[in-house]
Amino acid sequence: MKNKVNIDVPDAILEQLDDSVFESTNYGNPEIQRVGPKVRATTGESKVQSSIDDVLSNTLKDGMTISFHHHFREGDFVFNKVMRKIIDMGYQNLTLAPSSLTNVMNDIVIEAIKKGVVTNITSSGMRGTLGDAVSHGILKNPVIFRSHGARARAIESGEIKIDVAFLGVPNSDEMGNANGMNGDAAFGSLGYALIDAQYADKLVLITDTIMPYPNTPASIKQTQVDYVVKVDKVGDPDKIGSGATRFTKDPKELKIAKTVNDVIVNSKYFKNDFSFQTGSGGAALAVTRFLREAMMAQNIMASFALGGITKPTVDLLNEGLVNRVMDVQDFDKGAASSMKLSPNQQEIDASWYADPANKGAMVDKLDVAILSALEVDTNFNVNVMSGSDGVIRGAIGGHQDAATAKLTIISVPLVRGRIATIVPKVNTVITPGDSIDVVVTEVGIAINPKRTDLVEQLKQVPGLPIYSIEELQQKAEKIVGQPAPLKFTDRVVAVAEYRDGSVIDIIKEVAD
């Protein structure tokens, strides 16, 4: 069955997932019944355990669904520690449902798949050796990729039923009151883990620092926690987040960032109390810097900045240019350390951030979003998941969610090396073109023709080169030529869902 973005989804996949095809970015106002976790009452006994082995014996069975968060990023020690125990204890047929998978997790997940320990995965994304292995058919069942908002929705609705959540935290007291702001391995907001804490049947905290009771502020609360496991170390602070922010000096990135800024400040959305999400890449950080200068020059103050937060965004808060920072994750130490000092840097969970099936998410109030891409096609569809070789090497993250902003800008170079980024058709549609308003490259911009208001506004800007998306695609092709067609088998190795749970695309096994 074909969906709205002209992807033919096999009926067998729809039946296997009990799913429907993507039809619209408009979620509407359905009435939804949420699920609740099982709770075993306790009366104040310490929950601290010295061994993960006993906890696994008491909580985990074959066929269950387990979850982790990715806030430690490449500095994560918890995931591998727990998965090693699970493999060694011989568990089978588990569903792995983390908020995302980072490179440091790849080797042990591949081992778990080969040994039959993990037979299903749902995640925001994957990269490196794991992405390559899945793309070549290592996993028994298709991976399901969901955005951060869609994952929250799926957990709340029971589509993802977490039996046991293993959440690493830099601190906890003996009852399970914990936060991400204090300790050697502090990473700031626990945003993506909080939904697991709320809905998992069993919640296991793993920490290297036991604090006096009661430990506050408590992002995760003792009312949610079953066990606290003390370990030597939960993470490497130097790999959790970057240190001092380094602004890009790359001329191409700076040109893109300057053009993105020109689009924003010349749009109707650049006014007092506007809101924005900028991201964490080199060009995104440069946009934040240019935006700061424009806000100061025009005496404009933003109501809130949203999403993954960086030190430059926190600086805007401290300078009085942003009223609130709504923080679902922190990308650097500066952002992570400031949360405990500022009441205006608010920790939010993934549902509050981006869930379409609640009573109002932050993305619903977002004016401007600046997002990146691996590819954009002539229908403005965006791929952030698979590379030019067809191999999985990315993550949906909050891309689909933030793209619901009133002004969604994709910042992307025209080509990367010898690979075009503006193409006739993307390998994998992740964010539909209906969500995208402007594509910005170093040579110029393309405006979605459906946005006639933006066309009228931006064509008045002196020196702003405007092309059709087809013209940008042709410029890219002239530089790098046409690539050879990719070869795939008929086997589906992954399914990309839209934020409402419908199937927006499928990823097939790469043929060698």
From Swiss-Prot:
Location of this chain's protein in the cell: Cytoplasm
Gene Ontology BP annotations: acetyl-CoA metabolic process
Catalytic activity: citrate = oxaloacetate + acetate; citrate + acetyl-CoA = (3S)-citryl-CoA + acetate
Entry-linked InterPro entries: Citrate_lyase_asu (IPR006472), NagB/RpiA_transferase-like (IPR037171)
Quaternary structure annotation from Swiss-Prot or TrEMBL: Oligomer with a subunit composition of (alpha,beta,gamma)6.
NCBIfam families (alphabetical): citF
Protein name, UniProt field: Citrate lyase alpha chain
Species for this entry: Leuconostoc mesenteroides subsp. cremoris
This protein's encoding gene: citF
